[in-house]
């Protein structure tokens, strides 16, 4: 009994000597989550407040095409399609269920909220640390490129969501999870082929670091691509497959777009990107030393940043610009948060009080521990200011004036020549449902037979003044025959005050005495 009592006393003494866990990490995590909720609520409010603002031509194109699908049109056959089908299907489902434009803005906000939640979960899986995961979620919620452009109905938000969903099972590192990740990667490719760099990086990572999982991942990928391709071919025919993945091949190479996009990313998010690069280096070093416990997926994080950032190479093609960097923002947020919290993260090599004291000594890196969070705080404050300025911009009043002009001269269901967003708002139709006017102009330049027939039909209607009202912008101005026929039979009556990329000029048929 004496020995048992002595052992009990020693155990109690050791327990008393073990330092009590501090409450502040838990409070910090919940504080970060509360801030994320506040940011997402403010973002949703801003999206709804500017629901009818003209954000981007692509926004109008996807909305118009999705609305036509909800009315029974067939994508790639009845409606011009230049991207894989999933984003059109998402919009069509919302319209089919009775949703309006404000509903689509709510969908955009919901996609952003889901991406933020997945960034938090990915942070837990990659780094095994709730504080890092919470900081990554807050950083992602504030990054301005995604926050500004996610309000438009575009392919990039659902692509970002599916990229994160595809990463989540991959990081489980089991054959079954790898197969599921392959299927989700196929879904991401059927959202937009810009997922290809991340797919290549994932395959390279598995081949280099997790060879036994490469086979199951490829099985899921092949099965997913095969099933989706069969469904699409049955729905729209072989031409649908071509338009879905090669519909934008007519756009030329333009290195200037790449330079402008890189410059834009640097000016908007450069400080956070720099921290992410530093975080990737620290992450790579930690994963090589195997010192961080509870983070078996740590070695994937730098690969994720590299593959996601490679999406900027798509801007070498004209018509694709900096909004594609939305796909890289989860990786930027995750690695920046890791770099900031790296200096204060526990790294016990052993267990017990001695290990805790050793960790306290190694964790005292005051220069790094103070400088990096301070730098991120300054960067996020600047980013928040940019977010507020971007979301405060609205042009709904100018859009309403143009819509009123259309309503005054065209009935719902009438065919007009206009950017697709205005056709959607007024319930009118675009000739041939050729809503992607930029790709249409490029196909006219390449003498595509369908595009040439479209131009001949529209110019014939313009010459006969059968189209009641015409709205031109920088994309339709690239179609020279259209512009010539317009000048011959129509007169400009109004030009809005929007920026050049959104500016429209309203034309009405000339009177007989004009």
Language model features with spans:
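Extracytoplasmic
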Residues: 83, 194-195, 235, 373-513
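Hydrophobic, aromatic-rich transmembrane alpha-helices
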Residues: 268-297, 302-309, 336-339
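Perimembrane helix-loop-helix junctions
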Residues: 6, 13, 178, 197-225, ...
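Transmembrane-helix motifs of polytopic, lipid-linked glycan transferases
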Residues: 106-127, 142, 165
């Amino acid at each position: 009994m004496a020995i048992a009592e002595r052992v009990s006393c020693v155990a109690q003494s050791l327990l008393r000597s073990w330092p009590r866990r501090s409450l502040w990490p838990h409070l910090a995590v919940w504080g970060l989550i509360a801030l994320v909720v506040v940011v997402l609520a403010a973002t949703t409010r801003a999206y709804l407040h500017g629901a009818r603002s003209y954000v981007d031509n692509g926004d109008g194109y996807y909305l118009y095409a999705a609305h036509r699908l909800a009315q029974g049109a067939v994508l790639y056959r009845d409606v011009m399609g230049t991207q894989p089908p999933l984003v059109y299907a998402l919009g069509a489902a919302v319209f089919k269920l009775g949703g309006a434009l404000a509903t689509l803005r709510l969908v955009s906000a919901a996609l952003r909220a889901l991406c933020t939640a997945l960034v938090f979960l990915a942070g837990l899986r990659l780094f095994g640390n709730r504080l890092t995961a919470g900081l990554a979620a807050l950083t992602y919620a504030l990054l301005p490129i995604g926050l500004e452009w996610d309000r438009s109905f575009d392919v990039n938000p659902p692509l970002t969501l599916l990229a994160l969903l595809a990463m989540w099972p991959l990081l489980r590192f089991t054959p079954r999870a790898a197969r599921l990740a392959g299927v989700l990667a196929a879904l991401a490719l059927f959202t937009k082929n810009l997922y290809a760099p991340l797919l290549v990086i994932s395959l390279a990572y598995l081949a280099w670091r997790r060879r036994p999982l490469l086979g199951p991942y490829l099985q899921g990928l092949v099965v997913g691509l095969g099933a989706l391709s069969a469904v699409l071919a049955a729905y729209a025919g072989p031409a649908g497959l071509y338009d879905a993945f090669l519909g934008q091949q007519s756009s030329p190479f333009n290195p200037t777009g790449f330079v402008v996009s890189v410059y834009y990313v640097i000016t908007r998010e450069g400080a956070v990107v720099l921290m992410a690069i530093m975080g990737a280096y620290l992450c790579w070093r930690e994963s090589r030393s195997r010192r961080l416990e509870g983070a078996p997926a740590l070695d994937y994080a730098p690969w994720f940043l590299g593959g996601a950032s490679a999406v900027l190479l798509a801007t070498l093609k004209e018509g694709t610009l900096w909004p594609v960097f939305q796909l890289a923002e989860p990786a930027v947020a995750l690695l920046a948060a890791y770099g900031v919290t790296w200096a204060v993260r526990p790294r016990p090599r052993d267990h017990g009080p001695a290990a805790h004291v050793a960790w306290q000594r190694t964790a005292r890196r005051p220069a790094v521990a103070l400088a990096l969070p301070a730098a991120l705080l300054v960067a996020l404050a600047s980013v928040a200011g940019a977010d507020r300025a971007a979301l405060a911009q609205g042009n709904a009043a100018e859009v309403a004036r143009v819509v009123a002009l259309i309503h005054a001269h065209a009935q719902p269901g009438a065919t007009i020549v206009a950017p697709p967003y205005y056709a959607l708002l007024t319930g009118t139709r675009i000739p041939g449902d050729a809503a992607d006017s930029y790709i249409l102009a490029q196909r006219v330049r390449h003498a595509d037979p369908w595009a040439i027939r479209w131009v001949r039909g529209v110019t014939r209607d313009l010459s006969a003044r059968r189209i009641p009202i015409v709205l031109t912008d920088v994309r339709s101005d690239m179609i020279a025959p259209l512009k010539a026929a317009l000048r011959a039979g129509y007169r400009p009556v109004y030009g809005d005050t929007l920026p050049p990329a959104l500016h429209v000029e309203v034309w009405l048929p000339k009177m007989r005495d004009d």
